[in-house]
Amino acid sequence: MCMTMMSDISQDLLEEILSRVPITSLRAVKSTCKRWKDLLNDPSFSKKYGGKRDNEFLAIMTSGSRASLMSVNLHGPRDNKDLEDPFIKQIGELNQDQIFKVFHCDGLLLCITNEDNTRLVVWNPYLAQTRCIQPIDKFYIYDWYCLGYDKDKNHKILVVYSPMFGRIEYEIYSFLSKSWIVLSFPTDWQISRDECLSLKGNTYFIAYKKMEVEEVGFQEFLLCFDFTNERFGPLLPLPFQCYNQTSLVLSTVQEEQLAVLCKRCDAYETKIWITTKIEPNAVSWSYFLKFDFKVDISGGSFFVDVEEKVAVLFCINREKEKGINNKTYMIGEDGYYKEVDLGESNWCPSMCSYVPSCVQV
């Protein structure tokens, strides 16, 4: 009888096997043998296979104080309408306590907790590494926290203190120097929503001009913080006339483009645009999808699949008499529609795409 040893498995076959291991099981797999650990920690392996599982991608969902790793399949449900498996499902819990917000950048998660306002936690679930960041002063959950990196891939954290506490300040933490600095510069704008995300190392916000605040509302713009120059860029145009009475949500497309969803609060019509060019000082847009959607998406999240021409929305459904349920909706052209109930919750689900990486913290 001939027995094949684990060490006899070809490199290609080993990569194929390990690429299918759930991220929540990686710690146990790495402890099996040195060869597996070295491969899983190889940046080229995580870049090649990270987040790609048979047309699926990974996402982090936070709701209340829980953070979960989700698998989202935008291809199967539309290709086979009789498919019973949901297009989104939980594949694991992330072991950080009392998470209020998660900000994703380059495979790292910046975690803001509910209870402890004396530290931030930077976490790489793929490598099972964490770093606690002590502030100059206390953190507050209603401030803005952003993770990014400069042109040399040096990671940094930006904290924008909320004006509701009587101060508008900016602080930046460098992983390289392990220290904070206070940034000071005049601005003619104000960040208007709890909407910010990372793209190519920089962070994008929604903002308005201070002098344009009126009773009828104010026009909003896109605003970029450049982590290389450690400065905000100019106000950039959105692809529509957007005022504060409008539901507006940002998302990324394959870590290369920015997408924006717009829905007026007094109408069902919902539109999505995708950038054709995105830089700290310039942006251009292309129309992507239009559909009618009755549910309020304020505070929610969404993803798009350009090839399938579909959007996946995550928001609270308040139609039930008892309790509030989180729901996911897949909507496409020609009236395509599918929904999945994610369970009862008093918190709107916040979703961000997640691609494992070997960035050290």
From Swiss-Prot:
Pfam families: F-box, FBA_1
F-box domain ranges (all copies): 3-49
Disulfide bonds, paired cysteine numbers: none
Segments crossing the lipid bilayer: none
InterPro entries: F-box-assoc_dom_typ1 (IPR006527), F-box-assoc_interact_dom (IPR017451), F-box-like_dom_sf (IPR036047), F-box_dom (IPR001810), SCF_F-box_component (IPR050796)
NCBIfam families from the UniProt entry: F_box_assoc_1
Protein's name according to its UniProt entry: Putative F-box protein At3g19560
